[in-house]
Amino acid sequence: HSGLLAIRQSIAAGVNITYKILYNDAVAMTGGQQVGERPEGHSVAQIAHSLRAEGVVKLVVVTDEPEKYHGRTHRLDSSAVRAGHPELINDLPPGVEVFHRDELDRIQRELREVKGCTVLIYDQTCATEKRRRRKRGKLATPDKTVIINELVCEGCGDCSVKSNCLSVEPVETEFGRKRRINQSTCNKDYSCV
């Protein structure tokens, strides 16, 4: 499961490649464990420092919450690392840029032009885990809900194509096929807007 060896080998071989690391706040298969709880755990910043130390040429973070990284770049005191205090590594390494997920396509295109091994860390909580936490009252439900008015919908399907969201579903009406948002599967991330 560890991709670190593959990244290390790509760097050693001088391969032009971009790795995408999904940091989704959940451990797959075994279910529901959080990641990065402990100081020696694997936060995005700690992963970024490890990759930078391995020799990754360019490293970026793409997230739906770029504001949580505001002020967390370029501040690492390397003496804290040498002194054996990995818990102090909570800032991103120098040169790591943070982008909103809306810029994912552009960032991927830029990274594929960079010579050497590059890494894109995508930081967003798993949508299924978010829905589970909302259902259990552990995560606040957003105040806004997206609804498609079937009486106004022209049935063109552009909203499905543009958002690429599975919750935008076709519905047959007396006026033909229209679209609606399935609220039970909606992640409330507003990617369809």
Model-derived features with residue positions:
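Extended, hydrophobic alpha-helical segments in both membrane/secreted and soluble proteins
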Residues: 1-13, 17-20, 47, 148-165, ...
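A general structural signal for short secondary-structure junctions and capping/turn motifs
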Residues: 8-13, 49-53, 108-114, 155, ...
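Short coil/turn connectors at secondary-structure junctions
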Residues: 12-18, 24, 54-58, 114-117, ...
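Thiamine diphosphate
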Residues: 1-33, 37-45, 105-106
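Structural signature of the thiamine diphosphate
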Residues: 48, 55-136, 186
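Glycine-rich phosphate/ribose-binding loops and adjacent secondary-structure elements
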Residues: 2-3, 8-9, 132-134, 139-145
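Iron-sulfur cluster-binding cysteine motifs and their immediate structural context
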Residues: 123-125, 129-136, 154-193
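Short beta-alpha connecting loops at secondary-structure transitions
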Residues: 27-39, 71-73, 77-81, 88-93, ...
